[in-house]
Amino acid sequence: MRLQPLRDPRLALSLMLSLIAVVAAERPLDERAARPDEWGYRPADGARVALNPPSFTWIAPADAVAYDVEWSADPAFPAVGTTTAASVVWPTYTHDAPLAAGTHHWRYRARDARGDATAWSRARRVEVPAAAAILPLPGRAEQRARVPAGHPRLFLRPEDLPRLRELVRGPEAPALAELRAAAERYLAAGPTPEPPHKGSARDKTNAELIKYWWPNRVQVEQACTEAETLAFVYLLTGERRFGEGARRWLLHLAAWDPQGTTNFTLNCEAGKPLLHRPARAYDWAWDVFTAEERGRIQATMRTRVLEAWNSGEVARGVGHLQRPYGSHANRVWHKLAEAGIAFLDEIPEAPQWLDYALNKFYSCYPVWSDDDGGWHEGVSYWSSYQSKAAGWLQVAQTALRIDGLRKPFFAQVGDYPLYLAPPHSPNSGFGDLSFRPLDAPAFLEYHVRARAASGDGGNAAYWAWWAREKRQPANGGIIGLLYRANLPAPAAPRPPADLPASKVFRGIGVASLHTTLLDSREDVHFAFKASPFGSQSHGHNPQNSF
């Protein structure tokens, strides 16, 4: 059959445009393999997940600005029976409702700035067991609906205030007296000044910068403690002089130069506290500020958070979600979350900060861990990083009604030090600083208490015993009061005589074998390491070591 030329130019143009559209819609998707420092494609094909819904993650193509994600029980993805999430902004997606238990297949495609889509990725199979913990991620609209319209929002909600104020008039009166005395001292002494000298650890040959690197962080933390204490005492008492003190301190902090000695890029250790601790004080004393004063605080906070947002540690969210193994970067996301919650509706980017932090928490936190509670960097860095995560878990629960303890890691978070650094142990297994004994961290009280309200209590009684034997310091101040006010009583300490004497932390490749967990002076302890993380970050020990 001989083809005849098209005589209608409009029809020819229409067919040409249709052909272009088909070709554009089917442009290939770059599905390169993940590099060693990337999170990659998860759940992997054939994986069995512990959380429902699972977090789908993938490699972001260079020109991608959004994604569509589909999952179905049928690998052919028929129209009926396939769920589609469109216009996903991160290279990860967690649904806002649990999936049906069973086998699912998932795939994604990318869209560029014009809205043109790639072909779909290959399908990956995932098993969602009926016993998986339920932890859906609320979408942006639901995030806003859950956060109180008023203040406070961080650690407390407006409806919590009558109960807390009643407590400090009764059994918690000594705690209020302690906080009030501290606030009085701060009012008498005046605000801690802005650090006058630049400090940084970036140039190891510059002794002058290194000299002030850590002291500047200490000075910043002190100034923030003063502001938080004044704001919290005002929140509890309503006494105007403490509110005026909080107002003075917050405006003082807002006047510090974000490009000066506390600049995030120059010294992230001094800059990090200023991403979230002024937000706490602002939230607790919100009603003492005029609109003009709020604007000044908002402008400074926006400048500081945006510098962190654009830094290599966050890389505008997408960068860190793709490459989440940076140690310092894992201390930033929850600080952005607190700022996002405190300044929701006040700073334009605040909803983005919060949404990023939630997607980070769901899809790739913790990164140096396994579901058994292990921590690749060792118990010293486990202690440091989990002391910060404990604050986020409280904020997530109060502001967003998200129970982060449902994550398997947190359900077993205290097992790692129990097995790697039992009482009287002369060292603490593997990882940075493991040559020395581990002091019991105060934050473990949060988990010992919170496990009673989340699940069956798990091993909390054994953690309480470990903390007692290791002489865990008592939590005082604001955190101690919040623990007692918002959490159940801690589990009674129980010696781990009935626990297995050994445990394998499979995800970090560590086996810790004992003859007894009760006293290292009577124990034969043999530990092995063959970690899939290698010697990255603070997990310095060589492979196949013991």
PLM regions and their residue ranges:
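Extended polysaccharide-engagement surfaces of secreted carbohydrate-active enzymes
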Residues: 381-546
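Pro/Thr/Ser/Gly-rich low-complexity, intrinsically disordered linker/stalk tracts
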Residues: 27-62
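Long, well-ordered core segments of solenoidal/helical folds
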Residues: 182-191, 245-261, 296-319, 352-373, ...
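Recognizes extended acidic, P/S/T-rich segments that occur
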Residues: 68-101
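Well-ordered alpha-helical scaffold segments within catalytic/enzyme domains
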Residues: 151-170, 224-240, 251-260, 273-293, ...
